[in-house]
């Protein structure tokens, strides 16, 4: 079982070039948390997208995803099918030039919405429509 977990982690490491962020007080985690505030979203032109289905829809629509944070700790507990889908989504995001940032569970829980933890949160650029 240990060899399988090592192989799975190496797949994630081959996709991302950054170290896993383990501190909830990390500057990138804190700045991402601020995007929960509507005024900050309007000021920055960035928004949070939580969940695999929602992120996949953005990728399919060719919306600009700046960065995807993923819970590297929970990856090991996914089913084989879910791991494959998770990996495919990360590869597609990387191909569209999104940064991929692994987080441990504690900092990830700070940016995820409520109890809904699908292991993925994206930061995307949006263009507000004119009313």
Which positions does each model-derived feature cover?
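N-terminal positively charged helical leader segments and presequences
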Residues: 1-115
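Acidic/glycine-rich phosphate/pyrophosphate-binding loops and surrounding catalytic core
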Residues: 115-131
């Amino acid at each position: 079982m240990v060899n399988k977990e090592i192989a799975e982690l190496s797949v994630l490491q081959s996709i991302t070039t950054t170290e896993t962020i383990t501190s909830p007080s990390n500057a990138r985690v804190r700045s991402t948390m601020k995007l929960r505030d509507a005024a900050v979203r309007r000021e920055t032109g960035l928004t949070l997208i939580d969940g695999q289905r929602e992120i996949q829809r953005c990728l399919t629509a060719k919306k600009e995803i700046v960065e995807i944070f993923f819970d590297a700790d929970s990856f090991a507990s996914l089913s084989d099918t879910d791991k494959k889908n998770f990996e495919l989504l990360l590869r597609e995001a990387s191909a569209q030039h999104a940064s991929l940032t692994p987080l441990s569970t504690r900092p990830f829980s700070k940016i995820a919405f409520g109890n809904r933890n699908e292991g993925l949160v994206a930061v995307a650029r949006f263009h507000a429509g004119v009313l």
